[in-house]
Amino acid sequence: LDPTNVGVLKVFAGITPVSAGGDSIGGTIIAQSRAPEFAPAGQSITKGELGAFYRGNNQARGANVSVMYATDAFNISYSGSTSKADNYTAGADFKTYDFTGRAGHNLPRNEVGSTAYDTRNQTIGLAFKSDNHLFQAKLGFQDMPFQLYPNQRMDMLDNTQRSVNLRYAGQFDWGSLDARAYQEKVDHFMDFGADKRYWYGMGSMVAGSSVASQPCAPISSTCAAGMPMLTEGKTSGVSVKGDVTLGQHDVLRVGGEMQQY
């Protein structure tokens, strides 16, 4: 979920309610996208938003756009964003060396390696409202060419995510009902990025160096081309929950969820 699309952010510290997951350790953070907006009866509204940012330290830059058209019963929207940054730099040198472990690839002593990233997000949404009933459908696409991690041995060098979300929300005399169905497909690739050693084994070591590596061949017990990890995942699920009003101060909350990985 892109930050510009966040509508509500809830934080549960410590014990988490079952309705919010219930299986968290230490707490739960729930991020909800913006609720669809509808026009007054007999009217229509059109909205748009443009945004951009730039930060000098790591040349971080990004932009976002959103457009929306709605009547009193229909809403269609699109949002897109992009964000990219290079490695960031510290206030002064914090290393006594320039090498990264890869022959010929050095970093300035004040540069924090493996902190760069590049990501793009797009979402299309449809919503229909009839009295106290709401139907929503969302298509999402995320393309992340790389996300480097300074505190991990591996980096994410490609990630593509496609998602479909359907939702029904209704208000009744007895309470409320919320039902969802969703599917997410992810193509994920991790390996060592440019700021980490990429080739392993005796056959890859630079002569006279104990820290630098170089390309080697053929791949064998003495030559390893990094540690590529390709993952293809699909998650599908449905959830239903209802709040039954028992009295002025009492609510019975029931629900169920089924998920397949």
Range-by-range predicted roles:
Residues 3-49:
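A beta-strand signature from Gram-negative outer-membrane beta-barrel systems
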Residues 8, 13, 28, 47-51, ...:
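Membrane-embedded beta-strand positions in outer-membrane beta-barrel channels/transporters
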Residues 30, 37-38, 45-159:
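Periplasmic-side early beta-strands and strand-to-turn transitions of outer-membrane beta-barrels
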Residues 70-73, 127-132, 170-174, 243-248:
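Outer-membrane beta-barrel strand-turn architecture
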Residues 90-112, 191-228:
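Solvent-exposed loop segments that connect transmembrane elements
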Residues 115-119, 132-177, 185-206, 224-232:
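Flexible loop and strand-edge segments within Gram-negative outer membrane beta-barrel domains
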Residues 211-261:
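Outer-membrane beta-barrel transmembrane domain signature of Gram-negative proteins
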